[in-house]
């Protein structure tokens, strides 16, 4: 991937956490050390005023954060609560300049068939697309690995994730493709994404084993990221890993490895 096209998004839940307690200072550090963007998970537990000021002060992009509430979308009973919360998340995304929200599917529910849960997901995401229409904000559903980090999670297949978001027929609904989770599940990027790069709204990377910085494990991250870029992905690369080295050094090394 050419350095000119590379935009690295530091997940400040983990990056710069050892260097700064508050998220505003982590934003400043990410900017100072060359990241083009930042991202985080939940927004309702953060000092949004200080984060907004740090984003304005540095000019760094906020690439994404998690849509709240984080409840099981596999349960139709949660639909109204999620959609109500989504409206607040969209307002916050527009305030902070983020164009992508991340959705978690939730756990595989006992007593409910997989098809029933999938139908609930599609129904809720379709309604979410209607809320997002015209807002400039999109929602990415994230498949996660169920072998190490998220045992019991419903959506562990990228192919199934793409099937679900395509079933909504909503252009505002896509996936977040996490290369680490995909690799843990034994997936090949080219095989599982195929001709659906338009449905990939955001990507995350980390190495395996350990979920640490690129170069610490065995995943051929450059090959996978290059394939995504060559097939049309032009968004930020989310650095969602637990750094073993200093965060600033891992950003520089990731840029070198991917470039």
At which residue positions do the language-model features occur?
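Catalytic-core regions built around general acid/base machinery
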Residues: 50-58, 127-132, 195, 223-227
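Active-site acidic/histidine proton-transfer and metal-coordination neighborhood
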Residues: 57, 76-174, 184
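N-terminal substrate-binding region of glycoside hydrolase catalytic domains
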Residues: 27-44, 66-71
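Active-site-proximal loop/turn and secondary-structure-junction residues that shape catalytic pockets
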Residues: 14-16, 42-44, 68-71, 107-109, ...
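Short hydrophobic interaction/assembly module
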Residues: 52-80
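Glycine-rich, proline-tolerant flexible connector loops at the mouths of alpha/beta enzymes
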Residues: 39-57, 105, 112-113, 148-149, ...
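Histidine-acidic metal/acid-base catalytic patches
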Residues: 1-34, 97-99, 123, 155-177, ...
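Conserved beta-strand positions in the central sheet of alpha/beta enzyme cores
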Residues: 39, 64-66, 102, 140, ...
